[in-house]
Protein backbone atom coordinates (compact mmCIF):
# COMPACT_ATOMS: atom_id res chain seq x y z
CA UNK A 1 0.00 0.00 0.00
CA UNK A 2 1.43 3.41 -0.94
CA UNK A 3 2.14 5.98 1.76
CA UNK A 4 -0.55 8.32 0.48
CA UNK A 5 -3.11 5.48 0.58
CA UNK A 6 -2.31 4.86 4.25
CA UNK A 7 -2.76 8.55 5.02
CA UNK A 8 -6.31 8.53 3.68
CA UNK A 9 -7.38 5.77 6.05
CA UNK A 10 -5.82 7.13 9.25
CA UNK A 11 -7.91 8.34 12.15
CA UNK A 12 -6.73 11.80 13.12
CA UNK A 13 -7.30 13.39 16.51
CA UNK A 14 -7.23 16.91 15.04
CA UNK A 15 -6.36 18.81 11.88
CA UNK A 16 -2.66 18.83 12.71
CA UNK A 17 -2.38 15.14 11.78
CA UNK A 18 -3.19 15.49 8.09
CA UNK A 19 -1.31 18.81 7.95
CA UNK A 20 1.86 17.27 9.34
CA UNK A 21 1.45 14.24 7.07
CA UNK A 22 1.29 16.60 4.09
CA UNK A 23 4.52 18.43 4.96
CA UNK A 24 6.21 15.79 7.10
CA UNK A 25 9.86 15.02 6.66
CA UNK A 26 12.85 17.14 5.87
CA UNK A 27 12.10 18.23 2.31
CA UNK A 28 8.41 18.74 1.53
CA UNK A 29 7.98 22.15 3.14
CA UNK A 30 11.13 23.39 1.40
CA UNK A 31 9.87 22.16 -1.98
CA UNK A 32 6.47 23.78 -1.46
CA UNK A 33 8.18 27.01 -0.42
CA UNK A 34 10.22 27.02 -3.65
CA UNK A 35 7.00 26.82 -5.65
CA UNK A 36 5.27 29.62 -3.75
CA UNK A 37 5.59 32.34 -6.40
CA UNK A 38 5.88 30.45 -9.68
CA UNK A 39 6.09 27.00 -11.24
CA UNK A 40 9.57 25.49 -11.45
CA UNK A 41 11.39 22.84 -13.39
CA UNK A 42 13.13 19.90 -11.74
CA UNK A 43 16.59 21.46 -12.01
CA UNK A 44 15.39 24.72 -10.47
CA UNK A 45 13.94 22.82 -7.53
CA UNK A 46 17.13 20.77 -7.14
CA UNK A 47 19.20 23.97 -6.96
CA UNK A 48 16.70 25.70 -4.69
CA UNK A 49 16.47 22.95 -2.06
CA UNK A 50 19.99 22.74 -0.68
CA UNK A 51 21.25 19.25 0.06
CA UNK A 52 18.43 17.22 -1.50
CA UNK A 53 19.47 14.33 -3.72
CA UNK A 54 17.92 13.73 -7.12
CA UNK A 55 16.37 10.47 -5.92
CA UNK A 56 14.83 12.12 -2.85
CA UNK A 57 13.51 15.06 -4.87
CA UNK A 58 11.80 12.67 -7.30
CA UNK A 59 10.25 10.73 -4.40
CA UNK A 60 9.04 13.85 -2.61
CA UNK A 61 7.59 15.37 -5.80
CA UNK A 62 5.66 12.15 -6.46
CA UNK A 63 4.26 12.15 -2.92
CA UNK A 64 3.28 15.82 -3.12
CA UNK A 65 1.58 15.17 -6.45
CA UNK A 66 -0.21 12.13 -5.01
CA UNK A 67 -1.38 14.27 -2.07
CA UNK A 68 -2.75 16.82 -4.57
CA UNK A 69 -0.45 19.61 -3.39
CA UNK A 70 1.29 20.10 -6.72
CA UNK A 71 0.83 19.30 -10.37
CA UNK A 72 3.36 17.96 -12.83
CA UNK A 73 2.95 19.24 -16.37
CA UNK A 74 4.86 17.65 -19.24
CA UNK A 75 5.38 19.87 -22.27
CA UNK A 76 5.78 17.82 -25.43
CA UNK A 77 8.62 19.70 -27.05
CA UNK A 78 12.27 19.13 -27.81
CA UNK A 79 14.00 19.02 -25.43
CA UNK A 80 11.23 17.75 -23.14
CA UNK A 81 10.20 20.11 -20.36
CA UNK A 82 8.41 19.32 -17.09
CA UNK A 83 7.12 21.95 -14.69
CA UNK A 84 5.83 21.60 -11.16
CA UNK A 85 3.24 24.03 -9.79
CA UNK A 86 1.18 24.33 -6.64
CA UNK A 87 -2.45 23.30 -6.71
CA UNK A 88 -5.04 25.30 -4.77
CA UNK A 89 -4.40 22.91 -1.85
CA UNK A 90 -0.68 23.60 -2.09
CA UNK A 91 -1.21 27.37 -2.20
CA UNK A 92 -3.47 27.20 0.84
CA UNK A 93 -0.87 25.11 2.66
CA UNK A 94 1.88 27.62 1.88
CA UNK A 95 -0.30 30.39 3.34
CA UNK A 96 -0.65 28.28 6.48
CA UNK A 97 3.12 27.64 6.62
CA UNK A 98 4.07 31.33 6.43
CA UNK A 99 3.17 32.14 10.07
CA UNK A 100 4.88 28.93 11.17
CA UNK A 101 8.05 30.02 9.34
CA UNK A 102 7.85 33.43 11.06
CA UNK A 103 7.48 31.73 14.43
CA UNK A 104 10.39 29.42 13.63
CA UNK A 105 12.71 32.35 12.91
CA UNK A 106 11.77 34.12 16.15
CA UNK A 107 12.12 30.87 18.09
CA UNK A 108 15.49 30.02 16.54
CA UNK A 109 16.89 33.49 17.22
CA UNK A 110 15.52 33.50 20.75
CA UNK A 111 17.07 30.14 21.55
CA UNK A 112 20.37 30.82 19.78
CA UNK A 113 19.78 28.25 17.03
CA UNK A 114 19.70 30.73 14.16
CA UNK A 115 22.83 32.52 12.98
CA UNK A 116 20.92 35.36 11.25
Where do the model's predicted regions map?
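Amphipathic alpha-helical dimerization/coiled-coil segments
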Residues: 2-4, 33, 88-116
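N-terminal helix-turn-helix DNA-binding core of bacterial DNA-binding proteins
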Residues: 10-56, 76-77, 83, 91, ...
Amino acid sequence: MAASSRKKTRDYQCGLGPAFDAVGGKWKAAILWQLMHKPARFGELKRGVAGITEKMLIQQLRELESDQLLTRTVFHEVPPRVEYALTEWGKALNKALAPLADWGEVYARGTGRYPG
